[in-house]
Amino acid sequence: MLTRKLFRTAWSYKAQFISMIIMITLGIGIFLGFNMEWYTIEYDTSRFFADTNYADFRLYDQNGFTADDLDKIAGINGVNAATRFLSVNLDIKGKTNKSLALDVSENFSVSTFVVMSGEKYDENGEGFWVSDKFASANNYQLGDELTLSFQGMDISGKIVGLIKSGEHMICVADKNQLMPDYNTFGYAYMSPKKLRTVIREKLKMSGFPENLITENAIDEAENKVYAQVNILSDMDKESLEDAVKNALGRTIMVTPKTDHVVYKEAMGESEEGKTMGSVLPVLFLAIAILTMVTTMHRIATKEKIQIGTLKALGFKNRRILRHYTSYGLFIGIVGTALGAGLGYLVCKAVMSENGMMGTYFDMPDWTAATPFFAIP
């Protein structure tokens, strides 16, 4: 009997009940959605960074790093892996306003990529491993010839793999570009061996006597080209700076991953999600609570006679109290259920390959994740 009365009363106050359910739905939906968003960002990016050995620190020296320098850095206690690294923006020959960030990671255990299709990485390969998004946007296929322009010379090779890289998860040409545009800019990797071939050809073009273009001469030129070392390490910046200075006998620039545009922007998006997930739900839930208090007071005042009748019929105070409490429980259950669905939709609208973040992040996996405190 009391159950039927609950639904009759709910129908009588349907406007108030619907508004409370909507407010709770919005509050729970936004709370769950944005908390899922920031947690998904951290969960998916951390896995992607681990899969591609995203560098913890980047070391810069305009004079370049020798192979001996690399050995000394790699030998520092606390450095797990290190590589000499090159990244330079080059134009695509024959194409207007189209360029690539050409990367070379000498030790392919740091700053690597995952192959989406095509050949796996080969340190002696002669081809290019190209961003799959850039290839798709510009109609490049596996096996197509790609030619890059570098200081008056051509660097040519076939596209042997389509990839995604943590170093270019947010693929922008420089700090002035706010959003990725794969129609005009992407990235590619080539092998250290192909880089040495390019250096040899560059020395020839520069008028260097061919009989003097020895392996030692190429090594010297290569040392100047590698002006960056990427490392994996759990050390703090100050400790690493001191250790590198002691190892190399000179001071160089050390930047942590928190200063790198990819990591910095990803964590910035995560912090925005945390803020949205903690502020906005309070507003909607506060409105729902105020509406509920007002409505329940109105119901209790209007149904004094009915409450007296129920007591006369033998209903105990505890059961009557439980009945009127069930109004709030009913509203909360319905609103929470709808809010959980809305929260998932909010998360997927933001964190999916075809969602808002899909135009900003380039990752192979978009698994939605929920923090333990937001599990409904």
Name the predicted role of every residue range.
Residues 249, 289, 293-298, 303-305, ...:
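Small-residue-rich transmembrane alpha-helices
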Residues 2-289, 298, 317, 352, ...:
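Membrane transport/envelope proteins' first extracytoplasmic loop
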Residues 268-281, 305, 309, 321-330:
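Internal alpha-helical transmembrane segments of multi-pass membrane proteins, especially GPCRs
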Residues 30-32, 121, 164, 291, ...:
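Short, flexible micro-motifs
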Residues 23, 301, 310-312, 335:
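Helix-capping/transition residues at the boundaries of transmembrane alpha-helices
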